[in-house]
Swiss-Prot record:
Organism whose genome encodes this protein: Helicobacter pylori (strain Shi470)
Protein name listed in UniProt: Transcription elongation factor GreA
Single Gene Ontology BP annotation: DNA-templated transcription elongation
The encoding gene: greA
Keywords (A to Z) from UniProt: DNA-binding, Transcription, Transcription regulation
Any one Gene Ontology molecular-function term assigned to this protein's record: RNA polymerase binding
Gene3D superfamilies to which the protein is assigned, alphabetical: Transcription elongation factor, GreA/GreB, C-terminal domain, Transcription elongation factor, GreA/GreB, N-terminal domain
Entry annotated with the keyword Manganese: no
PROSITE patterns named among the record's database cross-references: GREAB_1, GREAB_2
Database matches in Pfam families: GreA_GreB, GreA_GreB_N
Keyword Transcription: yes
Annotated family: Belongs to the GreA/GreB family.
Physiological role: Necessary for efficient RNA polymerase transcription elongation past template-encoded arresting sites. The arresting sites in DNA have the property of trapping a certain fraction of elongating RNA polymerases that pass through, resulting in locked ternary complexes. Cleavage of the nascent transcript by cleavage factors such as GreA or GreB allows the resumption of elongation from the new 3'terminus. GreA releases sequences of 2 to 3 nucleotides.
Length: 164
């Protein structure tokens, strides 16, 4: 598996979720299964089957998060030069087809939130922009077709991961 770039915030978020699953959720679901098992016939015990399904989900999530952590590449974007688009860059782009401006910050996949302008480094937009410079024209394949953009600015600003 490839390295997964992320900020320290993203890494800490994943580690906290993994800890919660291992130390709280997993023991709780084991108790729920034991309680449900005590309710009799397991073939028709909906509570037992629901708890077992939840346990499978928790265990799968633990495996996924453990893989992400094992492959994490924590990057401090504040120390990178942002003369070209890279991880942690905030990019202001102009859609040349409709003259609309957009601003995006490139983050790790676990940190992305397009509604806040935080796009994953693996997204089609980010892939098209990474390595480009201010003033470059870029064609980006979007869901509604290809659009042409101009990079107006590239800079670093502290990333706001406000979780509210």
């Amino acid at each position: 598996m490839n390295k997964e770039p992320m900020s320290m915030h993203g890494y800490n978020k994943i580690c906290a979720e993994l800890k919660q699953l291992k130390e709280v959720e997993r023991p709780n679901i084991v108790k729920e299964i034991d309680i449900a098992r005590g309710h009799g016939d397991l073939k028709e015990n909906a509570e037992y089957h629901a708890a077992k399904e939840k346990q499978r989900f928790i265990e799968a999530r633990i495996v996924d998060l453990s893989e992400i952590i094992a492959n994490a590449q924590v990057i401090d974007p504040s120390v990178l030069a942002h003369n070209k688009v890279s991880f942690g860059s905030t990019i202001k782009i102009l859609n040349l087809d409709n003259d609309k401006e957009f601003s995006y910050t490139i983050v790790g996949s676990v940190e992305s939130d397009p509604s806040k302008g935080l796009i994953s480094f693996g997204s089609p937009i980010a892939k098209s922009l990474i390595g480009k410079s201010k003033g470059d024209a870029v064609s980006i394949q979007l869901p509604n077709g290809e659009s042409d953009f101009e990079i107006l600015d590239i800079y670093y600003k502290e990333i706001c991961f406000d979780e509210n």
